[in-house]
């Protein structure tokens, strides 16, 4: 009966207008895609951008989705890992946050909370509120791409999402040995690693997946993976525009599943590859603010500290 029901259905044909027809698919080899990616990665050494920032904290998995207001802001970044991000309230242009990272440590100043937060850049302590998981170095991974060396294993596949077609480069790396649980000293851990290294077949894991839209062969998405196959970040790139003899995406959407937030960055003004003074990445603790050191034990994480006077700096 089900077959007859489908057989009795009226067949309809939809004529696609020329303007709605999908763009012809472009073709490329793995070597050509790697070359295009590396040229783009090397092309951007610094950037100074006026942006709008829109943060969504929470996900369907957490059960709570909280949409934050869109704020204006600035992003300063310089290789290898220096970044400063300032968010400002609309109309009054008053800072709502100011954060910096040099790749080793980060600092965040939140005027409304009178808090100055510091910690190591590789901190993986998840906060109860997703918005507190936002770190300046998360943006470094999105705005600066690491170059893929010739010795790095890379796989190529084709993929699709809806009507879009993609080339996907999968970058793999040797699995990072983890210390043996319960090892009481460094000697036992070292011995375990030595025994593991004696295996003739290396253990591999995915480092990144780079998506190229076959409509124009531009990078449209980069997935970065942590150990164990967990997605650390999923970054979408669109609205590519020519800037100073190179091109750059003016829309960057960052999703970090483990940190439970999404950040949409819309570029309004952009300058690339111009020198940025080192003091632009300096953020001293304002006087009278509460210092929260996330690198310390929770019991010692907050205390009153009167830092030197510091006027807010704007890029």
Predicted segment positions?
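C-terminal motif of bacterial Sec signal peptides marking the signal peptidase cleavage site
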Residues: 3-7
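An acidic-aromatic
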Residues: 80-138
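Gly/Pro-enriched, hydrophobic low-complexity segments
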Residues: 9, 156-288
């Amino acid at each position: 009966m089900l077959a007859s029901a489908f057989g009795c259905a009226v067949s309809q044909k939809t004529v696609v207008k020329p303007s709605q027809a999908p763009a012809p698919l472009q073709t490329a080899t793995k070597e050509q895609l790697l070359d295009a990616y590396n040229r783009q990665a090397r092309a951007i050494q610094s950037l100074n951008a006026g942006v709008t920032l829109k943060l969504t904290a929470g996900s369907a998995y957490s059960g709570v989705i909280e949409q934050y207001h869109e704020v204006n802001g600035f992003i300063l970044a310089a290789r290898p890992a220096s970044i400063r991000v300032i968010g400002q309230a609309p109309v009054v242009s008053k800072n709502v946050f100011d954060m910096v990272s040099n790749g080793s440590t980060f600092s965040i100043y939140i005027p409304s909370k009178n808090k100055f937060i510091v910690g190591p850049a590789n901190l993986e302590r998840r906060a109860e509120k997703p918005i507190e998981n936002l770190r300046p170095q998360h943006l470094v991974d999105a705005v600066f791409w690491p170059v893929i060396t010739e010795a790095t294993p890379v796989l190529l596949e084709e993929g699709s999402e809806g009507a879009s077609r993609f080339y996907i480069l999968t970058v793999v790396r040797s699995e990072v040995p983890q210390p043996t649980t319960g090892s009481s000293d460094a000697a036992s851990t070292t011995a375990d690693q030595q025994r593991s290294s004696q295996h003739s077949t290396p253990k591999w894991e995915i480092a990144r997946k780079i998506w190229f839209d076959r409509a124009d062969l531009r990078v449209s998405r980069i997935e970065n993976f942590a150990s164990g196959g967990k997605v650390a970040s999923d970054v979408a790139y669109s609205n590519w525009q020519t800037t100073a003899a190179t091109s750059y995406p003016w829309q960057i959407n960052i999703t970090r599943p483990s940190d439970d937030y999404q950040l949409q960055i819309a570029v309004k003004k952009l300058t690339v590859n111009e020198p940025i003074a080192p003091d632009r990445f300096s953020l001293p603790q304002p006087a009278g603010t509460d210092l929260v050191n996330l690198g310390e034990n929770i019991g010692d994480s907050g205390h009153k500290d009167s830092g030197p006077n510091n006027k807010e700096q704007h890029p």
